[in-house]
Amino acid sequence: LKEEITTEDLSFGIIPKLNVSSRLEHANTSLQLLLSSTKSQSVQIAKYLAKLNKQRQLITENALIEAKRQVVVNKEKGENNILFTGKPDWQPGILGLIAGQLSEEHYRPSISVSGRGEILRASARSISEFNMIKALNSCGDIFEQFGGHAMAAGFTIKRDNLKNFRDIISSIANETLGNVPEGPELIIDAEISPNWLNQETMSFLASLEPYGNGNPMPVFITKKVHVVSAKKVGRNGNHLKLTISHNENIYDAIAFRQGNRIKETKNELEIAYTAKFNSWNGKKSIQLTIEDFKVYE
């Protein structure tokens, strides 16, 4: 058991396991865990949810392979400002995960659809420059049901109306996002040397939690970073694990969803990153999470 539970532990460890039952089965299982009054029952349900979450991860990964292929095909057809993906047998509970990851990777609003009958279900995820619920409201009569907010929404729609909706929302996206680059603006808080990150400063950064919407983690930049080693990690080699050095100090770093950029790490780099304590076998070390990097010039 970890000594401290962080917001990151909640966001990426605990909450997905609580959500998974509603995605694949029924939310009642997670409710039973929260209401459980005995340790044995809690452990039993928690193990089941952890197993179900691994199943969800595999289902989502397989669906994403197909979704990414569809994005490439659609972009070749000129559909650049909104991402449409879908397959009849995708489980409704993973549609938001598919749309969210594609939106994050391409920095464009994304809509994922599934269903075999007359009525289809869809989830939408967006970016700050595109108000999704406002866009859906502009053609609200076309849906059976819809709802959400600026960054995320969902709807049901008749199959016969899907093409018309796709044309309308694509037109809105082209109007709105024509000059928006395919990547979010990364706000840098300070240029530092990583050796500034010690017990005292990390404790100060921890005191600023919880991080999240409206209070993002501080992002630092360091120039002239030497890459000691770099390798792809993750089930599909999607991520980069690096050992880097700066001013003769060595640091561990991870760059999520940037495995395809491994060739760039053969050069000295300028990196933008966040920092956190990583606990392993009772020992704490500082790990850098690289948000972006470029070759140092």
What are the roles of these predicted feature ranges?
Residues L1-L162, E185:
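Hydrophobic helix-and-loop "lid/oligomerization" segment in the mid-to-C-terminal part
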